């Protein structure tokens, strides 16, 4: 430095001492400067004061020489001390050169700068608040300084500044938040610790309402929560916990909608840094749970995003039990928000609603979403779904039904989706069909194929929920439509006669079924045809559950009608055998069995005829149907025709099963009728016919023993009065043409024989036959 240069009002001795390498000499110079400035203050000579500060700043603090810079720093601090309460008038000139030295490469100089600024701030106190942002910016850099002395000095200055902010009521939070939002994305641990400590302080000041600006810093807080430092994570958890307490205490002023997407993002765990992200996910899921409960329908526009985050968590194991429980609570609370009012047209709902003005979207929301999108990449969230509200008009909160259905459908299609998640998806679909049937039926054609495919799921519970959804689709009045087109029924096999309204009016108690009922039955049978393992393993289970969920009579009537036109005769026979077993053995079919047992009404006779025509695909099932309906003479006539059929091992096994059924509680009434030989001769003849069909087997012995218990076998002859009795019984069933039914049986069995012979001719392994 040129010592001959004029630095007045600084004396040459002061200038020389300020440039000295010894701290003690620079300190003496500082005391001289302090005395000089005090004189100027006493004289109210502000021009000279500014001149001194300018010289110290430009010629010393910003000098190229390190010792000069040190002298300038201590000199500026001395000026501040001399100015006292008047230092506020010169703070910019005092602070700026000191902050510049924060970037110096010399750690000792950075320490002196920190010391100088401490003295300046200590004197000015609240007057420094207008310059808070530049002070905070400088301190945030020193917080990550590698030198421990500098870091220690910055901590002292930091504590002083926090005390000033805490005791003041003039802190400009609006001006500070943009800087805070920028700095909160720092990856440096010390910088993060510094940021968190400041948020904690500001949050604790009663006059500072940081909650209003939480949407702008919440994303950054969740990213800090994923820090590798346990201490930083603990501090961040504490801050987030305090914010959540404040939210729960005063929910009316919280901008829930602006923070919903932030939580959606952080509720979804990326693969990177999985252990820390688990904490982020649990915390954000806890927040989401509280938000849904506190904000209610305000979060509905974000429901698709919430479900994207929540649904996968429902399949977590006990290692993430807390997250799973929080997700379950979110899911349950969100589901409760959907009401029948959501089924109204948007125009209707808007005219009815008069929401509070505080639900209007913030102007900053778009900018916030942009910053969120940018920040995702830095923390491994680049592949995570981000959702925008269903409607930008928050004045009328509407359900994002299209988005929800899209999310649910995607989870059903994903083979990796866990069982509990699949169950939750199906519960959602069922709930939506109950609450918003009119809107949901617009999505039914796209959902229907996947719902049918879900019947092949490994879990019984999933299948049960799936059947509930399908049953609701099939029975909902909202599904009434004139269109007969179906999802996934382009195959010629499924171009069947869809029963009209008369088919649904089988009995006064039969509920009306919509067009999807028949589409469902057609597609269900088609699926059984394509997946024989499904029919074998789950067919009876599925049909029995449907009989509980829907009207059993409708199910059997429609399936019989469809099977009547089935071209795959082998499948038709197998399906009839399955349906017949269900009809005869399932507790769910008790009422239907009673309806068929007597055939006293026109409706029951019509049902019998419908079932009979399809049951003809399986001769033994047809006989068992006749036994159930007490058509013993017709059963006997059918058994007489068995001699013309191709008797296979499978056929005899079915006869064996029928004998076992006759011994079961289902046919108790039939066995008791054996006591009345006089009025049931054809029952006995039919049973003897079965006996003659059987080889010498256990079933043969069983039936033979039963028939040996029949009293007075000589009375089995058909007498004239018995013919009258039988005739009288048939007169009670005027709607059944038994001769025509017998002819139909012959035609169906002829087709089966023809197909069997064709198959035998093409195959080297024909059906097993008895020679």
UniProtKB/Swiss-Prot annotation:
Q: What does this protein do?
A: Scaffold protein component of the PI(3,5)P2 regulatory complex which regulates both the synthesis and turnover of phosphatidylinositol 3,5-bisphosphate (PtdIns(3,5)P2). Pentamerizes into a star-shaped structure and nucleates the assembly of the complex. The pentamer binds a single copy each of PIKFYVE and FIG4 and coordinates both PIKfyve kinase activity and FIG4 phosphatase activity, being required to maintain normal levels of phosphatidylinositol 3-phosphate (PtdIns(3)P) and phosphatidylinositol 5-phosphate (PtdIns(5)P).
Q: Subunit details for this protein?
A: Forms pentamers. Component of the PI(3,5)P2 regulatory complex/PAS complex, at least composed of PIKFYVE, FIG4 and VAC14. VAC14 nucleates the assembly of the complex and serves as a scaffold by pentamerizing into a star-shaped structure, which can bind a single copy each of PIKFYVE and FIG4 and coordinates their activities. Interacts with NOS1.
Q: Got any disulfides in this one, which pairs?
A: none
InterPro entries registered for this protein in UniProt: ARM-like (IPR011989), ARM-type_fold (IPR016024), Vac14 (IPR026825), VAC14_Fig4p-bd (IPR021841)
Query: Region Disordered: which residues?
Result: 334-374
Which protein is depicted?
Answer: Protein VAC14 homolog
Q: Which gene name does the record give?
A: vac14
Instruction: Provide the species name.
Output: Danio rerio
**Keyword vocabulary terms for this entry:** Endoplasmic reticulum, Endosome, Membrane, Microsome, Repeat
> Which domain of life, per UniProt?
Eukaryota
Is the Protease keyword given for this protein? Answer: no
Gene Ontology CC, one term: endosome membrane
């Amino acid at each position: 430095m040129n010592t001959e240069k004029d630095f007045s009002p600084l004396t040459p001795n002061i200038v020389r001492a300020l440039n000295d390498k010894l701290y003690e000499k620079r300190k003496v110079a500082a005391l001289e400067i302090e005395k000089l400035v005090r004189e100027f203050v006493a004289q109210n000579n502000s021009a000279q004061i500014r001149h001194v500060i300018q010289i110290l700043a430009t010629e010393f603090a910003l000098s190229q020489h390190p010792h000069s810079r040190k002298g300038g720093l201590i000199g500026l601090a001395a000026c501040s001390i001399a100015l006292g309460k008047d230092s506020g008038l010169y703070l910019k000139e005092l602070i700026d050169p000191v902050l510049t030295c924060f970037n110096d490469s010399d750690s000792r100089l950075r320490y002196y700068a920190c010391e100088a600024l401490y003295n300046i701030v200590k004197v000015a106190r609240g007057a420094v608040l207008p310059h808070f942002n530049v002070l905070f910016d400088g301190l945030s850099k020193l917080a990550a300084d590698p030198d421990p002395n500098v870091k220690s000095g910055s901590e002292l200055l930091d504590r002083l500044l926090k005390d000033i902010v805490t005791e003041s009521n003039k802190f400009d939070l609006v001006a500070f938040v943009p800087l805070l939002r920028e700095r909160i994305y720092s990856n440096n641990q010390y910088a993060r610790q510094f940021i968190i400590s400041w948020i904690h302080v500001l949050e604790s000041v009663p006059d500072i309402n940081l909650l209003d600006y939480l949407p702008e810093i919440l994303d950054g807080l969740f990213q800090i929560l994923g820090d590798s430092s346990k201490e930083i994570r603990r501090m961040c958890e504490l801050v987030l916990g305090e914010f959540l307490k404040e939210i729960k205490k005063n929910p009316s002023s919280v901008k829930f909608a602006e923070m919903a997407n932030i939580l959606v993002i952080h509720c979804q765990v990326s693969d990177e840094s999985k252990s820390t992200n688990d904490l982020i996910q649990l915390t954000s899921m806890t927040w989401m749970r509280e938000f849904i409960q506190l904000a209610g329908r305000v979060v509905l526009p974000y429901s698709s995003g919430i479900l994207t985050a929540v649904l996968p968590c429902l399949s977590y194991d006990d290692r993430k039990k807390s997250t799973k429980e929080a997700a379950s609570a979110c899911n349950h609370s969100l589901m409760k928000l959907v009401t029948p009012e959501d089924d109204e047209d948007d125009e209707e709902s808007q005219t009815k609603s008069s929401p509070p003005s505080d639900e209007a979207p913030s102007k900053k929301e778009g900018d916030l979403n942009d910053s969120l999108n940018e920040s995702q990449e830095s923390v491994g969230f680049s592949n995570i779904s981000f959702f925008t509200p269903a409607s930008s008009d928050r004045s009328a909160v509407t359900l994002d039904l299209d988005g929800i259905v899209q999310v649910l459908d995607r989870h059903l299609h994903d083979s990796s989706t866990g069982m509990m998640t699949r169950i939750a998806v199906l519960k959602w679909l069922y709930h939506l069909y109950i609450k918003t049937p009119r809107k949901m039926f617009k999505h039914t054609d796209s959902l229907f194929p996947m719902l049918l495919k879900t019947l092949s799921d490994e879990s019984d519970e999933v299948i049960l929920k799936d059947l509930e959804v399908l049953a609701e689709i099939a029975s909902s009045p909202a599904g009434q439509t004139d269109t007969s087109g179906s999802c996934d029924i382009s195959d010629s096999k499924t171009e069947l006669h869809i029963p009209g309204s008369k088919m649904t009016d089988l009995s006064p108690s039969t509920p009306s079924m919509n067009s999807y009922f028949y589409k469902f039955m057609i597609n269900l049978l088609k699926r059984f045809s394509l997946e024989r393992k499904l029919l074998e393993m789950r067919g009876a289970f599925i049909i029995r559950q449907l009989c509980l969920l829907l009207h059993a009579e409708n199910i059997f009537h429609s399936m019989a009608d469809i099977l009547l036109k089935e071209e795959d005769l082998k499948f038709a026979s197998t399906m009839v055998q399955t349906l017949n077993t269900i009809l005869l053995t399932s507790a769910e079919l008790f009422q239907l069995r009673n309806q068929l047992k007597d055939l006293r009404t026109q409706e029951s006779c019509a049902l019998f005829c419908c079932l009979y025509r399809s049951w003809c695909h399986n001769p033994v099932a047809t006989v068992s149907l006749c036994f159930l309906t007490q058509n013993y003479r017709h059963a006997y006539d059918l058994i007489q025709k068995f001699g013309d059929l191709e008797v296979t091992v499978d056929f005899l096994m079915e006869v064996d099963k029928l004998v076992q059924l006759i011994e079961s509680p289902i046919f108790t009434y039939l066995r008791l009728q054996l006591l009345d030989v006089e009025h049931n001769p054809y029952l006995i003849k039919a049973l003897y016919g079965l006996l003659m069909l059987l080889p010498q087997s256990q079933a043969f012995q069983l039936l033979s023993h039963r028939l040996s218990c029949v009293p007075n076998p000589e009375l089995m002859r058909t007498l004239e009065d018995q013919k009258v009795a039988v005739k009288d019984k048939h007169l009670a069933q005027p709607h059944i043409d038994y001769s025509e039914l017998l002819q139909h049986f012959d035609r169906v069995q002829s087709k089966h024989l023809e197909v069997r012979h064709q198959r035998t001719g093409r195959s080297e392994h024909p059906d097993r036959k008895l020679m």
